[in-house]
Regions:
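Hydrophobic helix-coil surface modules that form long, contiguous segments used
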Residues: 1-101, 130-133
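Amphipathic alpha-helical substructures
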Residues: 180-272, 290
């Protein structure tokens, strides 16, 4: 008997081949496919990847609660249900694994957390995309940011002029693109970008706690917000309000860099309407880097020093009403090779051209991007 499920599906075919694979300490995975020779090689490799996927999800996003899960070859695409997914099986290995990961990860968000997909489609598809990208990075490591595509997709939507507030009901978007990009790209970007606010460690801890606290409770955005606030120690109502309920865009830039009395003066400006804290990195002439974090005053705090994989210095908060921000560092301009905003490129900044200033050797005066 299936307990705590809100949907179901079943499949049957006399010609299905059925195999199983046990996740240690977890569910029994079932695999059903047609007896087609061309599918044999990839489907024989799929179980090993799915065991690793479930183990990764259990460690990083919450414990899968049910005793089994089935991957069933269906007619087209992929569709998730509690404890089962129907997937198009005739794919290359990477594609088959990617589809299977995405559809099974839905069990955590569509299945267990079960947010209202009509009201908050990005809380299902977007969170699923974020976790799936993390899983795929574990299975097929890549050198670039596994979430970069979500920022690119969101920025493409903004540039198209079809961007609508993510708070709109799924049925009421004016275009299919607006709905799709908001549910998938924006949702993943929203979670990923939150790491630039609270730090990667707090984000990871918060996502795990979110699942444990809200499972089977149909959470809304405010529930995720409260969990992240408790984990990070900063206020996040401004982040959730502006990114979910408006179409404002983010654009912070460097106005200029200059030397004042032997010290480095950096002037920043908020060109867009969207608010965010700001990360700054200095590339020094000796090849080393220095990182600085400028909290937003609305946070009423700042992320913990150990919340990032790199050391950083926290500067005075940027008052949210001020369009500009200036800070001084006890560094000779001659020691600095470049000043960079958002060096990890975790934010959906619409204009990266003003995020970097390179300082030529011996540079003096006011240097602009």
């Amino acid at each position: 008997v299936a307990e705590n499920v809100h949907d179901f599906a079943w499949a049957a075919d006399h010609d299905y081949l059925h195999t199983t694979e046990q996740v240690p300490g977890g569910p029994l995975l079932h695999f059903f496919r047609k007896d087609i020779p061309e599918l044999e090689a990839t489907w024989n490799e799929l179980p090993g990847y799915m065991v690793r996927s479930f183990q990764f999800m259990d460690r990083h996003f919450g414990k899968y609660p049910w005793p089994q899960y089935s991957f069933v070859q269906g007619g087209d695409g992929g569709m998730e249900y509690p404890m089962l997914t129907l997937i198009l099986g005739n794919r290359r290995l990477g594609s088959l694994v990617g589809l299977s990961v995405h559809e099974s990860v839905h069990s955590w968000y569509y299945g267990v957390l079960a947010s209202n997909e009509g009201r908050f489609p990005w809380m299902d598809e977007g969170f699923t995309e974020y976790a799936s990208s993390e899983v795929m990075q574990e299975l097929f490591p890549r050198s670039d940011d596994p979430h970069a595509g979500s920022i690119k997709g969101y920025l493409s939507l903004v540039a198209s002029g079809k961007h609508e507030a993510p708070s709109i009901h799924a049925d009421h978007f004016l275009t299919n693109r607006g709905y799709g990009s908001t549910a998938y790209s924006f949702g993943e970007m929203f979670v990923h970008q939150l790491g630039a606010v609270v730090g990667e460690t707090a984000l990871a801890d918060g996502l795990l706690r979110y699942f444990d606290v809200c499972k089977f409770k149909h959470p809304e955005p405010v529930d995720f917000e409260r969990v992240m606030e408790k984990v990070s120690g900063v206020e996040l109502d401004w982040y959730f309000d502006q990114w979910i309920n408006t179409t404002r865009t983010l654009d912070y830039g460097i106005r200029g860099v200059l030397s004042v009395d032997g010290e480095l003066r950096v002037e920043l400006e908020r060109y867009g309407d969207q608010l965010m804290p700001v990360d700054v990195m200095l590339e020094l002439e000796d090849g080393t880097t220095k990182h600085y974090h400028i909290p937003l005053s609305l946070e009423r705090g700042a992320r913990d020093p150990g919340s990032e994989p790199f050391a950083f210095v926290t500067l005075e908060p940027w008052q949210w009403t001020d369009p500009t921000y200036t800070f001084m560092l006890p560094l000779s301009m001659a020691r600095v090779g470049a000043v960079v905003l958002d060096p990890m490129q975790r934010t959906a900044d619409v204009d990266l051209d003003n995020n970097r200033v390179d300082l030529p050797p011996g540079a003096q005066g006011f240097i602009r991007p």
